[in-house]
């Protein structure tokens, strides 16, 4: 892999052109659990960015002294180290969010994006480009989660970041039975897959139109 690629490209490409959930269709399973609210989506996006960036950096740093026979085991050990760090950090300083995310922080180690960037790029390039790519891959994953969570939280709960945006007086009550009701489907896990599917469809249309120009 060419090492003379500009650092800017390593950071910008994963945000859109090589966005892992939208282009490579990786890391979408966690969208079921962590996109019901914007807070959890932001937290998971930042956690994955930290783990992917740091693990890619150290995989690259150790690439020349890591025997090929234990390459993937070494990568998993590095990834699990940073997953433990972020998990303990959230439990220490953001306990409520950590409790909401439950086991899904620990399951970052199974996220295909983290291992994918380590295996496909980090072991082939110097540490700085590897870190930029890993960080941006996590951020690219994160903004997709946040976009989905904004729609789900607003229509499912009438809130954003826990703030009530739809006035309580608009909701149905005994006095006004025909008032507004939250869109219950958005609270259910399958809605995340529907929204991701629509996003992937729109992105493919935009990419195909751009390719024809």
From Swiss-Prot:
One GO BP annotation here? sodium ion transport
Q: Which UniProt keywords apply?
A: Cell inner membrane, Cell membrane, Ion transport, Membrane, NAD, Sodium, Sodium transport, Translocase, Transmembrane, Transmembrane helix, Transport, Ubiquinone
Give the membrane topology, semicolon-separated if more than one: Multi-pass membrane protein
- What GO molecular-function term can you cite, just one? oxidoreductase activity, acting on NAD(P)H, quinone or similar compound as acceptor
Instruction: Report the EC code(s) recorded for this entry.
Output: 7.2.1.1
Membrane-spanning regions, if any?
A: 21-41, 42-62, 77-97, 101-121, 131-151, 183-203
Entry keyword Transmembrane helix: yes
Q: What class of enzyme is it?
A: translocase
Q: Is Transmembrane included in the keywords of this UniProt record?
A: yes
Q: Where in the cell is it found?
A: Cell inner membrane
Where does the UniProt entry say this protein principally localizes? membrane
| InterPro entries membership | NqrD, NqrDE/RnfAE
Q: Which reaction does it catalyse?
A: a ubiquinone + n Na(+)(in) + NADH + H(+) = a ubiquinol + n Na(+)(out) + NAD(+)
Per the record, what is one GO cellular component? Answer: plasma membrane
User: HAMAP family, from UniProt?
Assistant: NqrD
Share what the entry says about its subunit structure, partners included: Composed of six subunits; NqrA, NqrB, NqrC, NqrD, NqrE and NqrF.
Main role?
NQR complex catalyzes the reduction of ubiquinone-1 to ubiquinol by two successive reactions, coupled with the transport of Na(+) ions from the cytoplasm to the periplasm. NqrA to NqrE are probably involved in the second step, the conversion of ubisemiquinone to ubiquinol.
Family listed: Belongs to the NqrDE/RnfAE family.
Name this polypeptide is given? Na(+)-translocating NADH-quinone reductase subunit D
Q: Which organism is it from?
A: Chlamydia felis (strain Fe/C-56) (Chlamydophila felis)
Identify the gene encoding this protein.
Answer: nqrD
């Amino acid at each position: 892999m060419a090492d003379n690629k500009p650092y800017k490209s390593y950071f910008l490409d994963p945000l859109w052109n090589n966005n892992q959930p939208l282009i490579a269709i990786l890391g979408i399973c966690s969208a079921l659990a962590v996109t019901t609210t914007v807070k959890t989506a932001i937290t998971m996006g930042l956690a994955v960015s930290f783990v992917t960036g740091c693990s890619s950096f150290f995989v690259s740093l150790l690439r020349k002294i890591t025997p090929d026979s234990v390459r993937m085991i070494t990568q998993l050990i590095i990834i699990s180290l940073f997953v433990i760090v972020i998990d303990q950090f959230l439990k220490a300083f953001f306990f409520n969010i950590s409790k909401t995310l439950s086991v899904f922080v620990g399951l970052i180690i199974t996220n295909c994006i983290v291992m994918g960037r380590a295996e496909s790029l980090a072991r082939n390039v110097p540490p700085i480009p590897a870190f930029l790519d890993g960080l941006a891959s996590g951020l690219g994953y994160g903004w997709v989660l946040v976009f989905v969570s904004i729609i789900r939280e607003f229509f499912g709960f009438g809130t954003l970041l826990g703030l009530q945006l739809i006035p309580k007086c608009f909701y149905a009550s005994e006095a006004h039975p025909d008032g507004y009701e939250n869109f219950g489907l958005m609270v259910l896990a399958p809605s995340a897959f529907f929204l991701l599917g629509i996003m992937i469809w729109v992105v493919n249309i935009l990419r195909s139109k751009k390719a024809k120009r």
